[in-house]
Amino acid sequence: MIPLANGFRVSFMHGLDRLSPVIRKLKIPVILLGGGLQASLPYRSGIKRPQDESVKAFIGAIIDKSGSVGVRGEWTQDYLKQLCFNDVDVIGCPSMFMFGDKLNVQKKTPAIDADSRITINITSRITEMGPIVESHTAKYPNLSYIGQEMDALRLLLWGEGIRKMKDPNPIPVWPSHPLVRDGKTKLWVDPWPWIDYLRGTDFTFGTRIHGNIAALLAGTPAFVLGHDTRTTELARYFEIPNKLISEITPETDAAELYAEADYGPLNANHKKRYDTFIGYVERHGLSHVFQPGEDPTLFEKKVASIRYPDSVALYSGSAYQRYSRRTKRRVAKTIRKTRKRLHI
């Protein structure tokens, strides 16, 4: 089973090229579970893309083993059909079915106000989020930012910002940012405490698809700001409230997004989408915890019995001290190498 969320992209061509010959040599079935095209918006059908040949070889190898492939949304399905593959099923992303056919997202408060508990998720390279972060940091004192990138982890562990992005920056990529400096940046290495935290919040929004899915799994309203085909097609397939990042202005407010969001279609059609997903899984001979005779609550009970680490946090002073020591070691190492080369 191969889950490739955004594997059909230029930067992963080498990965596909390595996988294709391996798959062809296998003597067992190979199943693609939720593959996706990553491309800029608006999605354009029928154009030639640099990764086409790599994708053709990869999908051809899988279909020879399993007969069909499962993809995240209709744009990816259309893309593969343009490459002459017709055995393509739209099944969404497995993460949305963590709790099977049960999903119940309800608004916990009539409206969002200054006292609301809001979380924001951000893709650091999406600069359009800068003004949104600034305005919401000022307006909502209970706002927190949940990091999901390695850059965010380095920031919390070492106080190390993204060098190619200026400091100060409206996006929380440096220790000087108020959301980082004031301890409002969080990051979990396990999904369960992350989801538990989101159960205690009122609203989540931003550009990270799984940051928003984590909230939905917690029963908390979420709103996706789509910035590429991968995030947008998935939000549309699952009927998660969403807008394109191009539709967002510096004045866009979480309260407005919350007010316009309708979670009725998301909830009402979840069972149908679950049946589609499970039908694909069973058609390919995979067993699963939701089938007759299995008890999915056993796993949930085991998860509940585990004490997970708290979120990674930037503790005042200590991260800077670690980063300082790390930097000094790097400088000392560079000086030693330079002296050795110069025979000093």
Per-region residue spans from a language model:
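Active-site anion-handling motifs in enzyme catalytic cores
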Residues: 1-344
